[in-house]
Every structure is written in C-alpha cells, then in structure tokens.
Amino acid sequence: RDVLGSRGLGDVYKRQVDGKRIDKYSSRQLTAYRRYDIGFVFQFYNLVQNLTVKENVELATQICKEPLDIVKTIEAVGLSDRIGNFPSQLSGGEQQRVAIARALAKNPKMLLCDEPTGALDINTGKTILKLLSDMCKKNGITVVVITHNQAISAMGDKVIKIKNGIVDSVVINDNPVSVDAIDW
C-alpha cells in the first residue's frame, strides 16, 4: 500500500491509499475512513481514566466493523494480569501498551504509530515492535511508525526521513532486519 503526500515530492499532489485518492474524499468519507480503516497510537495515550484496561480497548472496538478479540489483544501486549486496572494504576509503559492494544483491536488496514516505544524499556519495546511486525504480516496491516529512534528504521520496508518538515529521503529496504537484531 502506498501513502503519498505533497511535501517534498515535487509537483505531485495526491494522497493515495489502496489505490484511492483520499484527498478527494468528502468530510463524511474521511471520517468513515479514519473510523474503519485507521488505527492510531498517539504519543500521549488518551486513555479514559475512569475505564479499565478492558473497557478502554473495548471502547475503540465499538466503532469498527470487524474488531479483534479484546482479551486476546490485551494478552498480546502483555497486560492480561492488568485487564481490570484503571490507567492511574498503570505505569507509563503499561498505559502505552493499552493504547497499542486499543488501536490493534480495531483491526485496521493501517496503523499510525507516533513513538510507540517511547515510554517502554528496550525489552518491552522489542516485544511491541515484534507484535506490530507480526500483526502487519498476519493481517496485512500497513504500519507507519513515526520515531526519532534511528535503530527502528532498519525494520522498515520503506524508510522516509523528514528534515525540517520536508521529505529528505525515501529508502526501500529490501532486507528489513528482525526486531531481535535491533539494539538501542
């Protein structure tokens, strides 16, 4: 799947996903596209403080067509023992994993992740990167990771470097490395 934008791409101005020009979508079409096809992992977790881990993940699945199993998704991010806890009872890394589970549970076509390992130690970070990689392969999800961590870029099929808000380089990586080979 290609995602293209205008900044740094010369005269090209199109935003194309799955062969569809989403820059031509109406406001209603864009809302539906974001609701059903995109999962977001924000740098700030945006968890609902008076909902449990399970309820926070469940919240996202209420607006999608074919959600993944909530409990299995929470298990996959290593939080099955915290399923009944509230965000205030979780560490920053655990809250980040709830946010990742919430995005994955939507079963999106594309997952946009802003610093998904930012609050995680290296081992948990690698676990999450492996999960994202496996989900990408298993479910055909396009995963876009925005990060300052250069080591992670070696995992990507396509690496786009941004400098001063403009595309500086685009590199196709024919041999992405496994998460086990990454160290930071």
What are these regions (language model features)?
Residues 1-3:
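Short, well-ordered junction/capping motifs at the entry into regular secondary structure
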Residues 6-7, 11-161:
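ABC family nucleotide-binding domain
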Residues 166-184:
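Conserved beta-strand-loop-alpha-helix hinge in the C-terminal portion
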